[in-house]
Structures are given as C-alpha cells and as structure tokens.
C-alpha cells in the first residue's frame, strides 16, 4: 500500500469500446489523472487512453478532484476505487472543544471491507484521531499518475567536460 498526494483531476471520456460479446458500443467512463492544470489533465488522459482506444476519443468532462490523498494497492485483484470521507478529531486549546475537519481520500481495494482495512493500516501509523464517516464505491475505472519522461539519456562514457581526456 502506497499513498500519493498531488493535484488530481476527474475526467470523463467517451469512446467506442468492443464489448465481451464482440459488439461495439459507445461508452462514457471516468478516470482520475495527476496534472497541474485542466489542459495538462486533458493531454494526460488522451495520452493514457490512446493506448486502449482505436477509434475516436472524446474528453467530455474535466473537473478538479477533492482528494487529499490517494491510496494505491499493490494487490492485483484490488480493482475498484472507493471514496472515503474521514474526519480528523482535534481539541481546540483555547475553547477546549472538539474540532472535526473532513478530508476525502480515494482508496483502491477489492471490497468495502478491504478498503476500510487499508484506511486503518495507513491511518494507524499516524497520531491523529479520526472517524471514517463515509465510504462509497465509485464508478472510476482507473487512476493515472504523472510520469516524467527521461529527457536526457545516459551515454556510455558520460563524463563532465572538465574531466574529459584530450
């Protein structure tokens, strides 16, 4: 289980999908991408989906996602995404009253019970008191993280100029 904090965008894409029975159908699916802007989010989802789509791909919606963090699972059969709303409990030192602040997370898991277990595993390592006040399965198909392309390829004898033999 690993977690990642970033700027996330929810995107909706429409494309022609080949169904299990071999028929073609136009589907609309939701994905989350890691990006810095709406333009970058659109570019990222087109790049990611172009591998899976043969025909026309239309980005029908982009919106900024409110996820504080996303928990990625390393287990192969964890194929669903759950939206978890947690409330962190703190005590206000001045008024000595309990304060609650809400944060939304996205959790990759096979089932609701496993998603709750993953939340407890990650949050159990912290010193923060919390309550899980909401945990719902989403219609998200996948989450795509930003990958920085390698701009400079390592050369065999990559030596700084001042060390070069002349």
Predicted regions located by residue number:
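Short, low-order "capping/linker" segments at domain edges
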Residues: 74, 144-156
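Extended, compositionally biased
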Residues: 56-83, 91
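Short aromatic-glycine-(Arg/Gly/Cys) micro-motifs in beta-strand/loop hairpins
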Residues: 2-26, 76-100
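Short, well-structured hydrophobic secondary-structure segments
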Residues: 34-66
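Short acidic DE-rich linear segments
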Residues: 153-166
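Mixed-charge, glycine-accented linear interaction segment located at domain edges/termini
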Residues: 104-144
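A cross-kingdom feature marking solvent-exposed beta-strand/loop segments within repeated
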Residues: 17-34, 51-54, 92, 97-105, ...
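Short, structured motif recognition centered on aromatic/hydrophobic residues
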Residues: 7-13, 31-32, 41, 45, ...
